[in-house]
Amino acid sequence: MSTLIATARKPSPPPADTASLAEVAYARIRQAITDGDLKSGASLRETAVADWLAMSRTPVRDALRRLESDGLLAHEAHRGAVVATLDESAILELYAMREMLEGSAAALAARHGREDELDTLRHIAAEEAGALNDAPRLVAINRRFHQAIFRAAHNRYLLKMLNPVHDGIAIMGRSTLADPARARDAHAEHLELVELLARRDAAGAEAVARRHSRGSLDARLKLQREIAKG
């Protein structure tokens, strides 16, 4: 069995009444990737994954093909399916999409977000202030903050486009929020964004969301170059 698969958290057995084992396999492998249990470059051999998930190879094969189509997996000669690795060109493309989509989400949230949704964002931002020196907790809170904005945008099609973008960011591993300076800057941008949403300033909210994404890109490129240097 692949060492990386062996060290990933063992999922619970698939439910006996599931309509599609392939769907279960897809969801569980995807979660292991986006949670960071399966790292970029990890090999996912059918037999090892089937043993890990306690199911046959057929649904696993279907799930791996679907994840490859999503861009979370790549196929390498002599290794088979591996968790995708993004080069700098792909990172730039990914963050260009993030900037555009998150800017649109912020503008839509300013126009359509309900007061209770804006209250939720205020509470999350306040919680975030107490987690700036706790990277794992901060990453989880940051995810909740952005998901709350996406929901407040009230656009199902935008959500469908954002999900693969954030999946792509997740496979890069270590969060840029582990850098204390970036954590402080990101929190300040979140507070600014909450204020603009409360004022229903769509143009201002979009501008800050785009700036926030560019700041994240700068931090990501710095981190990737540090990793490359070893």
Predicted regions mapped to residue ranges:
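Conserved amphipathic alpha-helical segments that form helical-bundle/coiled-coil interaction surfaces
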Residues: L94, R98, R111-S175, H187-R199, ...
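Short linear motifs at protein or domain termini
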Residues: M1-R111, L221-G230
